[in-house]
Amino acid sequence: MKLSHTLLATLATPVAQGLTLGSRNQAYSIIREPAKKELLQDLITWDDKSLFIRGERALMYSGEFHPFRLPVPSLYLDVFQKIRAMGFNMVSFYVDWALVEGKPGEFRADGIFSLEPFFKAATEAGVYLLARPGPYINAEVSGGGYPGWLQRIKGILRTDAPDYLKATDNYMANIGAIIAKAQITNGGPVILFQPENEYSGASVSPFPNKKYMQYVIDQARKAGIVVPLIDNDSYPGGTGAPGTGEGEVDIYGFDSYPLGFDCFQGGSYDPFGGYGYDQCYKLVNHEFSRVFDKNNLAAGVNIFNIYMIFGGTNWGNLGHPNGYTSYDYGASIREDRYIDREKYSQMKLEAQFMRVSPSILEATPGDPSTGVYSENKDVTITPMLSNKTGNFFVARHTDYQRRDSTSYTVKLPTSLGTLSIPQFGGQLTLSGRDSKFHVTDYPVGNHTLLYSTAEILTWKKLDGQTVVIMYGGQGELHEFALQNAMDVHHSSSSQLSYKQSNSSVIVQFTATSEHRNSAYNYWVPVLHKGNSAYGSSVMNPETIIVNGAYLVRSASVGGKTVSIQADFNQTTTLEVIGAPKGASELSINGKITSYKKTNEGTWLCNPEISFPTVKLPNLRSLDWHAIDSLPEIKPSYDDSRWTKANHTTTTNPKGTPLKTPVSLYGSDYGFNTGNMLFRGSFVAAGNEDQLVLTTSGGQAYAASVWINQTFLGSFAGNKNWATVIVTHAVPQLRAGGRYTLTVVMDSLGFNENLTPGNDDMKAPRGILDYKLHSSSSAGSDPTPITDWKIAGNLGGEDYKDKFRGPLNEGGLFFERSGFHQPLPPLDLFSKATPFDGTAGAGITYYTAKLDLDLPADEYDIPLAFRFDNSSAIAAPAYRALLYVNGFQYGKYISNIGPQTEFPVPEGILNHNGENWLGVSVWALDSNGAKVPGLTLTSRPPVLTSRNKVDFIQGPSYSKRDDAF
């Protein structure tokens, strides 16, 4: 539809822990007296309405992305470009302290834990950063980001206890200095810094502990942080808000979880035994985004962070007990970086509209109302009014959970008076879980939309015309009016009516079924300004508009050439709208591409697109080898190198007083990750018939018990139980005989430490209590168990694999020996497969070489390992650890679930060469266990313009002389 030569309106049809900062109708404004705040720099400033970046008022549309959950630095740019393509301009990120200071005093942020590649990728994509290093982060990671050795700190965590503060100093000094170098003042992408995280309540006085918060702030400032400090209260309680004195930040914000998840909200975490992330996504999907994201924007939110935008993976034991390996989160970008979820496209519509609507930052939010702007009280409308720059009205169902359709009309104030809309008659429609932005007096280039009920994706001022992309739901009637008279021309396929007058032109149309979701196909890449991907401005920068690709990563103009980086998942026609004057050549992914120019001035082309047939190896056909990974129960086993459990007291307040003669808590001996084994010795009285054992490993953990080589039984796990007391029947023992008790258990991470004072993170992992006795001999003393020893990851906090970090390896025999690394010593193994399994309880480690030959230079082909779970209910329970090239990338629990598919990113997997696959099988009952099926799967290939992915070449097997 062409209006005169000045407006080109393209009609299209479209169809959750987060940070919400600066809501202008909440009790706490961004800052009470911003003009009186002493700034340490002048590039990032603010007032009571928004941030300014280099003097430009900016709405920050942000998504959460944790680099530690994607240990392939060459993939950071891929994720950043996908976020930038949505119209977002910022990313928030946590740093996991536990990964960079596994041993007290030894800070290591190199290799895959280095932040410099993350900062570089953000800059290359044109994305600003909000840094959130804690020291406490929550984030559904083990200990909430606290390293396990903090269990030995006597002082209360997240307070001004001197030993706790001292423990944080090394980390905060080092990580603060790294982030400081990446601040915008040094040419980097970091524009905001958050000290601490969700510090919102406590079970200990005083609260808030202002001395503690000020200490964390001082740590950041001493490290060189000069950008504004922000807060994220768990709820709008005002903790640390500007004007509250010691411990106050510059900018106050709070979390918002509309659906009540502990998980503003881009998805949800999912616990062991949960429903799976695809089900989480259904609850917090594109419809959720339409309603709740727009509601936040209508409230005047101007720093808006979606948690998560990309979740990633809890690889290498980094997760907490209430979450499994996947941290997909039901986010807009899948764990494997695929962007086929509709929420991705819906958020793109919203963010792109905000980017071309800087006037919304000058508007004043009003209260949600019924019966004011619409006579239908089933519709609530929230106004955002401005005397200068346009008005915004967000319409939603009064009952936001309503799923049926509601018809309504509106009465909206305009510069020509209050108008009843649609003026041509008819009804607007709210279809199910939906909300809409209606605008009045909205500027588009040199023109003004008097009003529009259709939503706006973007607009662009061109030479001699202005392009506006509008959209509405299938079958919906919409109407817009342009101020000033102009001629109307439209294509014959457009179903519309219009009316002209001396003051305006009114256009009404109905979105048709053949245009369903076509708005999702539009991309608005920001044109580089010089070498800067940030473009000409933050709000409404110079762009072009591209229609038709799976993804448009970037666009630039050099001389006469328009260059576009795009990805394709199918053959398509590509349309380029807004090629600059003087441009005559089109390059797509580095190839000059011919095009046809339409009557409207757009370019149409058909890029060369083809897709390979992906052939993956059958994992059953690999040359598998196996080794017993529980030699500890054999009579000949030598445990002389084990750590003696000889602490008769503990500094852990959550485990005090001890119920055992010596501490059997893993962290008391430096074992903070993965499986642990315990061995104790006793002389039998001959009448023992019960072993009562109390263990603690976090929700869904398991434990198995042997006396010598006799299997007593297992606790196979429960999704709700972090600690359990199990009574095991003991077979007849020979009086005077010496026996060895062996306990194998897994730790699924430390608890988070959300409430200061509870010290939940210090809940110990290990054996809490035991009693070996005769149940029929009342009052008799239990049999003493002595000479306790404990085994965890080799070296404990002096962990062996510095490359893969302090959490990747647990304490099983194959892990201590390094057999999970590439090129293990197969001469020590025997031929066996996980599909055949074992006949009895125990642990077996299987390994095989996996060769791949995929066209990775041209195609992005996400891969995943899938365990067959079809017989999990009837089959014996087992647990499996999945290792890929030395990285632990899966914890499979057959009897609890829900995860059966484990994505492994390219870079961890070598898509063009040799890989080493490892699977440990822990059979939890006497019937043994086998893996019914394990397959390597792929998503459909995407023809990609991303940068080459570098293979993470970690250390291969080398004999560990101190292994046992």
PLM region spans:
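Catalytic-core region of carbohydrate-active enzymes that cleave or remodel glycosidic bonds
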Residues: K120-T123, V127, D218-P228, G243-G247, ...
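N-terminal carbohydrate-binding accessory modules
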Residues: G18-M90
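Active-site neighborhood of glycoside hydrolase catalytic domains
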Residues: D163-T239
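The substrate-binding groove and active-site-proximal loops of carbohydrate-active enzymes
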Residues: L59-V72, D96-L115, L150-N170, P189, ...
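Non-catalytic C-terminal accessory domains or segments of carbohydrate-active enzymes
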Residues: Y338, Y344-N912, W916, W922-F964
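Fungal secretory targeting signals
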Residues: M1-T20
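Aromatic-lined substrate-binding rim segments of carbohydrate-active enzymes
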Residues: L75-G144, I217-K222
